[in-house]
């Protein structure tokens, strides 16, 4: 059994020993920054067991989230949330249909849970861009103007590293004797391709305003400022908008630009 208390203590030790521990996480923009923030990414990864994803139907073909992506997102979550090893799919556009009402309905039971958990929104656009948000609470509608969420929320986007680039880097490292060829063999399968890798670009809460989350029966949104939403999805979960905002200091998240078509959308409970 995974020792939660022991892992929590080790995590705290890792963070306290970091040479960069006095840096403000609101300025972190990439997984490279995060590796500096935690002092040693290797020591972090050795502390936590891998994530198990629960809830995909055997018939679900277009799965948006992979365990490797979870490993990129975990460092930005609150320490106790990082310790959860099971992420549960609460809503999937492919499995449950394209409806914001259905999304809210699937998350309704979580509104009364006493446990402290987290929620990850994952979106895929027409150009295969993957992006989304982390929330400290389940998304639920407010018919009157009311923002929710707290400073744990953040926006993110993720890029897969092309296999040919990874393979070229592996060959370069081998030529320079920087890696052990035997250790690297399991990265390459029999077909000669390399397992997919992911690069995270994260946008934590800046403190500029408190417009973390705003949901109604007509739309779901995160982040705002100067008349724009950081991430906005319509009630049919077909169209979306993304803009830079003061709340998260984010860039445009979608590969399509400020307006995008939703090809896939999932909401996961962490814990």
From Swiss-Prot:
Q: Record's Gene Ontology CC terms?
A: mitochondrion; nucleus
The annotated region (Disordered) lies at: 15-41
An example Gene Ontology biological process = protein retention in Golgi apparatus
The molecule here is called Oxidation resistance protein 1
Bias (Basic and acidic residues): 23-32
Q: Is Mitochondrion among this UniProt entry's keywords?
A: yes
Q: Where in the cell is it found?
A: Mitochondrion
Biological role: May be involved in protection from oxidative damage.
Family, according to the entry, reads as follows: Belongs to the OXR1 family.
Keyword annotations of the record? Mitochondrion
Domain of life, per UniProt, equals: Eukaryota
Against Pfam families, the record matches this protein to:
TLD
**Segments forming domain TLDc:** 63-271
């Amino acid at each position: 059994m995974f020792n939660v208390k022991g892992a929590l203590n080790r995590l705290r030790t890792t963070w306290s020993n970091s040479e960069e521990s006095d840096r403000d996480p609101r300025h972190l923009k990439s997984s490279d920054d995060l590796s500096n923030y935690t002092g040693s990414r290797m020591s972090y990864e050795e502390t936590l067991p891998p994530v198990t994803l629960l809830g995909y139907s055997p018939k679900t073909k277009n799965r948006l989230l992979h365990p490797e992506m979870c490993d990129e997102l975990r460092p930005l979550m609150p320490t106790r949330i990082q310790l959860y090893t099971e992420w549960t799919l609460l809503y999937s556009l492919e499995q449950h249909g394209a409806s914001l009402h259905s999304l809210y309905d699937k998350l309704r039971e979580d509104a009364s849970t006493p446990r402290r958990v987290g929620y990850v929104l994952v979106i895929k656009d027409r150009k295969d861009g993957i992006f989304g948000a982390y929330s400290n609470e389940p998304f639920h509608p407010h018919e009157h103007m009311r923002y929710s969420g707290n400073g744990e929320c953040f926006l993110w986007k993720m890029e897969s590293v092309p296999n040919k680039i990874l393979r070229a880097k592996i060959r370069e490292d081998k030529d320079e004797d920087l890696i052990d060829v035997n250790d690297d063999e399991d990265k390459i399968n029999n077909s000669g391709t390399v397992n997919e890798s992911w690069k995270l670009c994260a946008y934590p809460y800046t403190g500029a305003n408190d417009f973390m989350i705003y949901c109604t029966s007509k739309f779901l949104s995160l982040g705002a400022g100067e008349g724009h939403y950081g991430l906005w999805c319509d009630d049919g979960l077909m169209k979306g908008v993304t803009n830079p905002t003061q709340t998260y200091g984010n860039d445009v998240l979608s590969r399509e630009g400020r307006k995008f078509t939703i090809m896939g959308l999932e909401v996961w409970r962490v814990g």
